[in-house]
Structure formats: C-alpha cells, structure tokens
Amino acid sequence: MSVLEMRRVSRTYGLGAAEVHALRDIDLMVDAGAMVAVMGPSGSGKSTLLTIAGSLEEPSSGEVRVCGQDLTRLSRNARARLRRRSIGYVFQDFNLLPGLTAAENVALPLELDGVPARRARKAGLEALESLGLADRASHFPDQLSGGERQRVAIARAVVGDHRLLLADEPSGALDTANGEAVMRLIHAACKRGMAAVVVTHDAQLASWADRVVFLRDGRVTDQTAQPAGPESLLGEIR
C-alpha cells in the first residue's frame, strides 16, 4: 500500500517574468516499508518536494495523498491532525523544544499519542542510545552540539508510530560513523513498516535506499531501484 502518493504535482512561485517553477509534474509513490532517497543539485526542488509531501505547503496543481487521504481536500485542522499522527519530520532547523531534555523531546510524540510516560521515556532512551546519545539524555538542546541536536531530532521522528518520515539532509552535520548510525535507525523504522523520503547529497547514505529519485530544475530526471553502490550515484547529481 502506498503511504505517499504525489501525482502531477507542480509548485510555482511568483508571476509573469518572475515566475519560478520549483516543481514540475512530479509523480512519486512510496510504499509502506520503503525508503526513497531524493538527490539533485541545489535548487532542484528537493526541499519543496518534502514540504508539500508533509502538508506544510500546498502545491500549485496536482494531488498529494498521505495514508490514502487527499491533502488538498482536507481542512486545515484535519491536515494538522494528520501531520501530528502520521508524519515524522527532520528538517535542518531541528525544531527541538528548549525547555525539554533530549529524552523528553524524543518521548513527546509518544506521550501526545497516549503512550504511558514511562514506556514513552524508555522508547526514547533506547532511540538515543542507538545514536550514541545515552549520556546526553538529560541535557537540554542548548547544551548539545549541532550534530547532537540533529540526532535527537531524528530519534524523535522515528520513535513514534508514524507512517511516513520526511528527512531533509538527516546526516548533514554528522561524521561518517554517526551518519551511518542515523541511516541504520531509519532503515530499522522502515523494516517496521514506516515509509521514508530522505533528501541527501551523500551518495554513500543514499545507497541505503530502496530507490533513488533524481531531481533537476524541478523535474524527476531519473530513478534508480536498489542502488548498486554510492559510485553509481555520483554521476547522476553532477
């Protein structure tokens, strides 16, 4: 079953001579349990694709469905409920709550969904431990490095019972070892049935995906199923 369906999705900004086509007739389907990596040069539309897929921005035309629901036909409140219950986000600003510790930030989505606090904290601590952050669980965001905050945000996105993960450069501030730990965590979440769309410039990390989609000038230029390895992807994004 497709968790995310995008059909002929376009996004245009501005008018007349100033018109910019960020996305052009995008078709993308992501099934439960699948990880799709999105690659392409800067300005190719990767981040716009994520914000539209996550109902944070409306397309100029086309249809977007998450868990079978047409986002373009839902009310604002219904879209907000769908985002909270079904979609995990990792964007480059991390968006951690400053008054909560790392463990509390990770556990929060579970508690909002009614998971008992003790069980939610246990799941949060396990996710942090898998990313090498067990000793940072009681630290507040301003006590963490940028890379540590990034890993906390990723743990929070995958620990809940979300159906879809949308991640923009989840390994951007991380070294190779921590980047691979992040991809292992996302891969494990997909094995449990979550669908994931990961924007990355890193061919090594994209090779974890079941499929790689290449964007250029807002269009899908190619798709590669089950990448053979990072070397096979490098030429596509140059």
Map each language-model feature to its residues.
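Short, low-complexity, intrinsically disordered N-terminal peptides in bacterial proteins
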Residues: 1-2, 235
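ABC family nucleotide-binding domain
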Residues: 2-208, 215
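Conserved beta-strand-loop-alpha-helix hinge in the C-terminal portion
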Residues: 219-238
